[in-house]
A protein has these predicted regions:
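Collagen triple-helix signature
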Residues: 1-248
Length: 249
């Protein structure tokens, strides 16, 4: 996870979460591939900014991205993609008499990692990783204060391609947007992340389901929901397509 910041300046940005590592590949003949690691969470801004004209809160750190799942060889399942890390919370700003203080921005959520492909002959594709939630905005304190805007939700990742026989991996869902911070006027909500397409089947098997979009965060202007994604195609000989993910609200 990224480190928190206790800095009181608006440019005291919290640390970014680290990215997850990629999963290992399956054996040349047989064996399942490894899953990708999850992204670390972004740090949060923990101190209230009291200086500046007007005071502005520090920004939360962005979450790290998930690692990709590994690819299978001849037979075996593809690796699952890692999930993104959550965005950090923005810092508070102002004192009781400060005018027009603004809370810090929430960090953006990390994106999911790609699902790995199934074995070339037989094997299911790995599911794509899920996008993470954006961080909430910080609070503004005092007259005419404004809350910080919420961070964006992370984007889901595509599901892996199936082997000649096998099902495609599900696409990852998008993360929700962060909520706007409090103040005399609330901050705006962050937009939800988009879902990702499901993996395709090839000869025999079902397509993976598409990921749904994340919901927008609450705020003076709510965030927009992310778009859901299409499912993967079914096998050319036998198999059904995946379902389409729902749009976020």
């Amino acid at each position: 996870a990224g480190g928190n910041t206790a800095g009181r300046r608006a440019d005291a940005i919290a640390g970014t979460g680290g990215d997850g590592g990629n999963g290992g590949n399956g054996g040349l003949l047989s064996g399942n591939a490894g899953a990708g690691g999850h992204g670390g969470a972004g740090g949060s801004s923990t101190a209230t900014t009291t200086t500046g004209t007007p005071p502005t809160g520090a920004t939360g750190g962005n979450g790290g991205n998930g690692g990709a799942g590994g690819t299978a060889g001849f037979t075996g399942s593809g690796g699952i993609g890692g999930n993104g890390g959550a965005g950090g919370t923005g810092g508070n700003a102002g004192v009781a008499l400060s005018v027009g203080s603004t809370g810090g921005l929430g960090g953006n959520g990390g994106s999911g990692g790609l699902g790995g492909g199934g074995g070339s002959l037989f094997g299911n594709g790995g599911a794509g990783g899920v996008g993470a939630t954006g961080g909430n905005g910080g609070s503004g304190i005092g007259p005419a204060s404004v809350g910080g805007n919420g961070g964006k939700g992370g984007v889901g990742a595509a599901g892996g391609l199936a082997g000649q026989i096998g099902n495609g991996g599900s696409g990852g869902s998008g993360g929700a947007g962060g909520n706007g911070g409090t103040g005399d006027t609330a901050g705006n909500g962050g937009n939800g992340g988009a879902g990702a397409v499901g993996g395709n089947a090839q000869l025999i098997g079902n397509g993976g389901n598409g990921g749904g979009g994340g919901n927008g965060g609450t705020g003076a202007t709510p965030g927009t929901g992310g778009a859901g994604a299409a499912g993967g195609t079914g096998g050319t000989l036998f198999g059904a397509p995946g379902t389409t993910g729902a749009d976020g609200t």
